[in-house]
């Protein structure tokens, strides 16, 4: 069973997390009205952002530094890579998830334009899809999204991560949503995007198969 934890929690919690799944006995559960009884014989834990970028790691082996940035709903997790290997001394979970952006847009849209914009409205505008909202609403959403991205990159710079001179692997639904703003920021040297929304889960399986093949 391959599982994962946010990079910032990996070092302290990985053993406890794997031990939880390795507990003795049969695990019984029902999935889609079908009962299952399984025994878990092997568990391996991986850092989440690293796993999501796993299929790109071979392209980063010659880079002294690269960064994986996983932008989710509640947090943005970053992890420094050195020659394609995770540096768990330089990682953290920042409270910069896109929920903050949604809330800010909702508040500003209501106060400045008397509009009630929900998440699906924001997603449609940021994706460039046609909506019935006026041009000033579109401009507000895009401006706040750009500010959100710029603020995130400034926070990373304060943590001694200058993205202008490195490859950055962007993963997570937030990164996919904000791709245009990321590319327009001018603050990322070489942005690379993992567009699979289930990239972490796929990465867990990929890394586990590599590890199992080498045993």
Task: Give the predicted meaning of each segment.
Residues 1-66, 86-100, 120-215:
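Nucleotide/phosphate-binding catalytic cleft detector across ATP-hydrolyzing
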Residues 69:
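Phosphate-handling catalytic cores of nucleic-acid transaction enzymes
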Residues 76-80:
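Short beta-strand scaffold segments in enzyme catalytic cores
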Residues 82-84:
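Short loop/turn segments that connect beta-strands within beta-propeller blades
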Residues 103, 107-111:
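Long, charge-rich alpha-helical interaction segments
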Residues 113-115:
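Short, basic interhelical loop/turn and adjoining N-cap
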């Amino acid at each position: 069973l391959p599982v994962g934890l946010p990079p910032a929690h990996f070092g302290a919690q990985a053993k406890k997390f794997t031990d939880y799944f390795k507990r003795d006995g049969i695990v019984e559960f029902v999935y889609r009205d079908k009962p299952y009884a399984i025994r878990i014989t092997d568990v391996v834990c991986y850092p989440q952002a690293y796993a999501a970028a796993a299929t790109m790691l071979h392209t980063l082996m010659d880079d002294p530094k690269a960064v994986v940035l996983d932008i989710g709903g509640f947090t943005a997790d970053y992890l420094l890579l050195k020659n394609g290997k995770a540096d768990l001394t330089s990682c953290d979970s920042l409270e910069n998830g896109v929920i903050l952006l949604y809330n800010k847009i909702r508040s500003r849209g209501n106060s400045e334009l008397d509009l009630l914009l929900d998440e699906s409205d924001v997603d449609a505008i940021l994706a460039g899809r046609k909506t019935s909202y006026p041009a000033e609403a579109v401009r507000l959403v895009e401006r706040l999204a750009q500010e959100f991205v710029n603020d995130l990159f400034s926070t990373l710079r304060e943590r001694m991560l200058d993205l202008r001179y490195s490859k950055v692997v962007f993963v997570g639904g937030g990164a996919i949503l904000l791709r245009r703003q990321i590319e327009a920021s001018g603050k990322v040297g070489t942005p690379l995007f993992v567009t699979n929304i289930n990239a972490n889960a796929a990465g867990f399986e990929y890394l586990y198969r590599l590890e199992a093949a080498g045993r």
